[in-house]
């Protein structure tokens, strides 16, 4: 574009800046456009070239399909590994919970048995004491009766 194609008109001047209006003159018929209006014509392709392009396209399709299948297989394998790991962790958790519960139940059983043994021992001590008191009383009673007579 030549400088004669553009006109600059000042609109207003402010402290924040200036405003301009640019007026572009219409293009002349003689000027050559910067870009071609139609795409360049393609050369005619031979049957061999067409066949090669079709084979290359088929090869690309097969390669893409193989890549997609490979990715799917990898994804399935990963899913299997994740599932196996989850099952293993679940089993480990179950075993640990079962062992913990068994240990707790054994501790409770031992505690209960110890408490029962302690109660039985106290009862035996009480029976022994009662028997001693009875013997002492019986041994004193006949003596008291003879003295009183």
UniProtKB/Swiss-Prot annotation:
One Pfam family cited in the UniProt record for this chain: Stathmin
Species whose genome carries this gene: Mus musculus
Acetylation found in the keyword field: yes
Subcellular location: Cytoplasm, Cytoskeleton
SLD domain residues: 4-145
Protein name: Stathmin
Modified residues (Phosphoserine): 4, 16, 25, 31, 38, 63
PANTHER family: STATHMIN (PTHR10104:SF5)
Posttranslational mods: Many different phosphorylated forms are observed depending on specific combinations among the sites which can be phosphorylated. MAPK is responsible for the phosphorylation of stathmin in response to NGF. Phosphorylation at Ser-16 seems to be required for neuron polarization.
N-acetylalanine PTM sites in chain numbering: 2
Protein family membership: Belongs to the stathmin family.
Function field: Involved in the regulation of the microtubule (MT) filament system by destabilizing microtubules. Prevents assembly and promotes disassembly of microtubules. Phosphorylation at Ser-16 may be required for axon formation during neurogenesis. Involved in the control of the learned and innate fear.
């Amino acid at each position: 574009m030549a400088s004669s194609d553009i006109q600059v008109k000042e609109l207003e001047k402010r402290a924040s800046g200036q405003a301009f209006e640019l007026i572009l003159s219409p293009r002349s018929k003689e000027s050559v456009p910067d870009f071609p209006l139609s795409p360049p014509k393609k050369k005619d392709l031979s049957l061999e070239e067409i066949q090669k392009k079709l084979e290359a396209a088929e090869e690309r399709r097969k390669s893409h399909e193989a890549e997609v299948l490979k990715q799917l297989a990898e994804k399935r394998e990963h899913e299997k590994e994740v599932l196996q790991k989850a099952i293993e962790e679940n089993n480990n958790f179950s075993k640990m919970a079962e062992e913990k519960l068994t240990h707790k139940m054994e501790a409770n059983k031992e505690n209960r048995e110890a408490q029962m043994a302690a109660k039985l021992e106290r009862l035996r001590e009480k029976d022994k004491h009662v028997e001693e008191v009875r013997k002492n009383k019986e041994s004193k009673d006949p003596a008291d009766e003879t003295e009183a007579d």
